[in-house]
C-alpha cells in the first residue's frame, strides 16, 4: 500500500471535472491532504485524545466520512473504554476498500485495539446507534447545505449524555479582509508544500462546486439549532478549524 505523490492536477486539463473521491484520489489521498490542509496531522492525532475523554463503555464511536480511516485509527489507539466499537462510514467504495486494508494492517501492528466496522453507506440515510463520540473530519462541507441541519439533529439524538461531536471543517469568513488574508495564506501553505500555480488553480476549479464551507458563526448557530448545548472551538490553523459540540 505505497503512498503516491499527488499529481492529479499537474497537467493542464481542457475541462476540469468536479472533484470526486474516486480511485485516482484514493491513491494519492494521504499526500494530498497532508499538503493541502494545515494542521491535519495534529487534528487527527488529537481527535483520539479528545474521544478518550468522552467515550463511554459499551457505546458506538462514529467516524463519519472516514476516507482512509486516519481518524478511526486514532480512535482505536487512544480509546480504552470497555465494550466500545468504532463504526467508520464512507460513501466512496474506493475509499472503503482501501480503508479496510489500512485497518487490517493496523490490526497486525497493535494489540487490544477497539473492534471496527467499516460501512460503504450514505451518512444522510444511516440509522445511528447510541453513541458517545461522533467524529466528522472535513465531511460536513461536502454535504448539501440544506441537508446539514437534519443530519446534525439526528447525530444529536444519537449522542448519549456526556458524549461529544467533534467537527472539523474548512471555514469561510464573513469579513472580506479576513477571508482574503486567510485564503492567501492557505495558498502560500500549498505553494510551500510543492503545489504549482496550475495545480492550485485546477484543484480550486474542481472543488469549488463540491465543497461549500461555512462561517464559524453559522456552524455554531446550526449546532445549537440541532440541539447541542455548547460549542467549543479547540483548534484552528489558518482557515481550518475543529469544534467540540456537547449535547
Swiss-Prot record:
It comes from the Bacteria. GO terms for molecular function: carboxyl- or carbamoyltransferase activity; S-adenosyl-L-methionine binding. Keywords: S-adenosyl-L-methionine, Transferase. S-adenosyl-L-methionine binds at residues 40, 65-67, 90-91, 122-123, 137, 204. GO terms for biological process: tRNA wobble uridine modification. It catalyses: prephenate + S-adenosyl-L-methionine = carboxy-S-adenosyl-L-methionine + 3-phenylpyruvate + H2O. The keyword Iron does not apply. Its EC number is 2.1.3.-. The keyword Amino-acid biosynthesis does not apply. HAMAP family: Cx_SAM_synthase. Belongs to the class I-like SAM-binding methyltransferase superfamily. Cx-SAM synthase family. Homodimer. PANTHER family: CARBOXY-S-ADENOSYL-L-METHIONINE SYNTHASE, TRANS-ACONITATE 2-METHYLTRANSFERASE-RELATED. Catalyzes the conversion of S-adenosyl-L-methionine (SAM) to carboxy-S-adenosyl-L-methionine (Cx-SAM). This is Carboxy-S-adenosyl-L-methionine synthase.
